[in-house]
Amino acid sequence: MARLCFLEKIKLNTIEFNMNEISIVTAFFDIGRGDWTPQKGLPHYLQRTTDTYFDRFANMAKLDNTIIVYTSEDLAEKVWSIRKNKEHKTVVITVDFEDQFIEQRDSIRKVQNNPEYLAKINPSQVKNPEYWSADYVLVNMLKSHFVNHAIGAGVVDTDLVAWLDFGYCREASTLNDVELWQYPFDKDRIHFFNIKNFNPETSITSIIANNDVHVTGPCIVASQKMWPELERLVEESFKELISKDLIDDDQTLLLMSSLKEPEKFELHPISADDWFIAFRKYNENLS
């Protein structure tokens, strides 16, 4: 897969790094989840409207950290409105998501439409979007790309950078009353949060077929120098799956990345029932 480039670089004034402060990169594109309804034969928990996502983002937006948001032009003003009075710590970069990443989207869709691929999937899992929504798989695959673009564009003002899903703070309590997120993550490692250790006897095909989550995707932390390493490994893992007529969302791509070069990663064990713990367990600034 060719390295993804889609935006002109943006250069801001260089700001001296603040030791353990963490810049946040996130993204939101409307891929139609508001229409993923039981009436269409889909599980009720898949449906999330644009308003649902922005309500959740409003919780995270209370942070004083720099937040860089990739979104569509029609939603940019909504982001600015939510970050009112924090504009100096906010960057919004607009992307025409539907018209970008055509090659990658087509590769994903080709696998998802392959009857041989679908036949491998556990029937109890087949309605989950990673098995049928190319946009869902694509936007999750691009997490490390968006972070690296932000770093290259000069809009990240700390050494530590986190990807946080746009809806990470599902409840206000997820933020844990934190105002400025800081934590001394090891800057020589890529930090994942895993709910299950990998068993070498388990095949990647089985993991995909059964939606067998090991590494979670909503929060990833690394220093600026380590994010290109993650993007490289994710791209390699994506190419590997496509070559085998397989596809999955970021959780399997992250697992595969950590297995390729484990020395570059630190896995932080978390409960399968409690994914959203960054501000409670990995934070040194409780207000």
Regions found by a protein language model. Give the residues of each.
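Active-site-proximal specificity loops/subdomain of glycosyltransferases
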Residues: 90-150
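Catalytic core and acceptor-binding pocket of nucleotide-sugar-dependent glycosyltransferases
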Residues: 168-170, 192, 212-287
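Short, aromatic/basic amphipathic alpha-helical patches
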Residues: 76-88, 106-108
